[in-house]
Amino acid sequence: MNIIELFGPLQEIIFFILEIGVILGSLGVVLLSNIVYSAFFLGLVFFCISLLYFALNADFVAAAQILIYVGAVNVLIVFAVMLINKPESLKIFPVWTVGDKITLAICLTSFFLLVNIILNTSWSNITVITESKGFLESNFTQNVQRIGSLLLTQYLLPFELLSIVLLVALIGAIVIARRENLIETNKKKVLQIKKSPTTF
C-alpha cells in the first residue's frame, strides 16, 4: 500500500509542504553566507526529498537517500565546513555583487521556465497504473537484490573509486582548513608582536 494513501485527502497538502521544504532549503543553501547554516539547510533538502520518495512508494530509494545523503554525506559536510568556517564570517546574508545578481537572474529564469513547463503539461492525459501488493513486494525484492548484485559485481570498481573520491575530498578540506588556521595564527602573532611595546 502506498504510504501517501494512508492520509487520503491530505496527500496534496503533504506534497505541498514537502515541496515548500525543498524550495526553502535550497534557497537557504545558496543564499546564506555561513557555510554551517547552508549545510544544515542541505540536510533539510535531502530529508524532504527522501520523504517525497516515501510518498511515491519508492521505499528503497528513500531509505538510501536518508542513509547515504542525510546520514553520511551531509554529516561529513557539516564536520568539514565546521573545520574550515572562519570566525569572522558572522553575517547571515552576504553582500550582493554583480556576479550574484547575474546568477540570481539566471536561476529565476530557469525556475520560471520550469514552472511554465509544469503548468503547460497535460497531466490529465497521464494514466496511473495500479499494481497489486504482491507484485510490488516481489518487484521491490528483485530490485534490491539486483542493485546489490550489480554494486558488488559489475560496478564494484566505480563504487569503490567513488568512496575514495569522497574520502579524498574530506581529507583535502581538513588539510586546507589546517593550513588556513596556521596562516591566521601566524598573522595574529605578527600583529601582536607589532602592537606590543618593546621592552629593553
UniProtKB/Swiss-Prot annotation:
InterPro entries: NAD(P)H-Q_Oxidoreduct_6 (IPR050290), NADH_UbQ/plastoQ_OxRdtase_su6 (IPR001457), Nuo/plastoQ_OxRdtase_6_NuoJ (IPR042106). Its EC number is 7.1.1.-. NDH is composed of at least 16 different subunits, 5 of which are encoded in the nucleus. This is NAD(P)H-quinone oxidoreductase subunit 6, chloroplastic. The keyword Translocase applies. NDH shuttles electrons from NAD(P)H:plastoquinone, via FMN and iron-sulfur (Fe-S) centers, to quinones in the photosynthetic chain and possibly in a chloroplast respiratory chain. The immediate electron acceptor for the enzyme in this species is believed to be plastoquinone. Couples the redox reaction to proton translocation, and thus conserves the redox energy in a proton gradient. It is a multi-pass membrane protein. It catalyses: a plastoquinone + NADH + (n+1) H(+)(in) = a plastoquinol + NAD(+) + n H(+)(out); a plastoquinone + NADPH + (n+1) H(+)(in) = a plastoquinol + NADP(+) + n H(+)(out). It is found in: Plastid, Chloroplast thylakoid membrane. It holds the Pfam family Oxidored_q3. The keyword Transport applies. One of its GO terms (cellular component) is chloroplast thylakoid membrane. It is an enzyme of class 7 (translocase). The chain crosses the membrane at residues 13-33, 35-55, 64-84, 102-122, 156-176. Belongs to the complex I subunit 6 family. PANTHER family: NAD(P)H-QUINONE OXIDOREDUCTASE SUBUNIT 6, CHLOROPLASTIC. It comes from Physcomitrium patens (Spreading-leaved earth moss). Keywords: Chloroplast, Membrane, NAD, NADP, Plastid, Plastoquinone, Quinone, Thylakoid, Translocase, Transmembrane, Transmembrane helix, Transport. One of its GO terms (molecular function) is NADH dehydrogenase (ubiquinone) activity.
